From Swiss-Prot:
Its cofactor is Zn(2+). It catalyses: 7-carboxy-7-deazaguanine + NH4(+) + ATP = 7-cyano-7-deazaguanine + ADP + phosphate + H2O + H(+). This is 7-cyano-7-deazaguanine synthase. InterPro entries: QueC, Rossmann-like_a/b/a_fold. Its EC number is 6.3.4.20. NCBIfam families: 7-cyano-7-deazaguanine synthase QueC. It comes from Maricaulis maris (strain MCS10).
Length: 243
């Protein structure tokens, strides 16, 4: 387990884009280790798996209880209502539609511009709250082909937001080049078995919002793309751990 007694950036604060899923929970732990003060922001855009909004609360409280040194750094949580955006960004995440590949090569779970909107709104909040760092769980390794998860997209957003706000904006993406097995490994490095257990039990990834089926890797339907990535990554990580 990594020593978390002293932040790497003792005078810096960060705002974490926090959905309550595996990736953002790992990013929150990463930020709490690294920065002196961390706040979180979530977005309610009419997603079908609205259960993630309650998962956010469980993960935050679990982190504070299990890791008091992180709890001391964990600040306020904000939830932004983006129902209007969800209404125009129709996808299988916001409507009762089949999860399948589309003619353009993207899955029907792709919400057009989602990360662009999230980062723009988060940057406005960060500006008001005095944060120079945004932390997001975007990843171009296990990302289902979403173009707004690529690092070149994030770099372009970082430049645009910095110019538009006339301030230095850093978008940190600690998972950008990690597959799901490496993401599980990072969580274990950050918080050991306690953090792994919290992510397995309390975070939510399933596109269908299933919380009735418990697997070794957590709750979910087990066959949507998000569950498959999480399950396969969990198995690969466990197989890589020395007996």
């Amino acid at each position: 387990m990594t020593d978390t007694s002293t932040p790497d950036h003792a005078n810096r604060t960060a705002l974490v884009l926090f959905s309550g899923g595996q990736d953002s929970a790992t990013c929150l732990a990463w930020a709490l280790q690294r920065y002196a003060r961390v706040e979180t922001v979530g977005f309610d855009y009419g997603q079908r798996h609205h259960v993630e909004m309650t998962a956010r609360e469980r993960v935050r409280s679990g982190l504070a209880a299990s890791f008091p040194h992180w709890g001391d750094r964990l600040g306020e949580d904000f939830v932004i209502d983006l129902a209007g955006y969800g209404a125009i960004a129709d996808s299988a995440l916001t409507a009762d539609r089949a999860i399948e590949m589309q003619a353009n090569g993207l899955p029907s779970t792709f919400v057009p511009g989602r990360n662009l909107v999230f980062l723009t709104v988060a940057s406005a909040l960060a500006y008001r709250r005095g944060h120079g760092v945004l932390v997001g769980g975007m990843c171009e390794t296990d990302f289902s082909g979403y173009p707004d998860c690529r690092r070149n997209t994030i770099d372009a957003m970082q430049t645009a937001l910095g110019l538009g706000l006339e301030m230095a904006v850093e978008i940190a993406t600690p998972l950008m080049h990690l597959d799901k097995a490496a993401t599980w490994a990072l969580a274990h490095q950050l918080g050991g078995d306690a953090l792994i257990g919290l992510i397995e039990e309390d975070s939510h990834t399933c596109y269908r919002g299933e919380r009735g089926k418990r697997h070794a890797w957590g709750y979910g339907c087990g066959d949507c793309p998000a569950c498959e990535l999480r399950a396969n990554g969990h198995a690969a990580w466990q197989n890589s751990v020395p007996a």
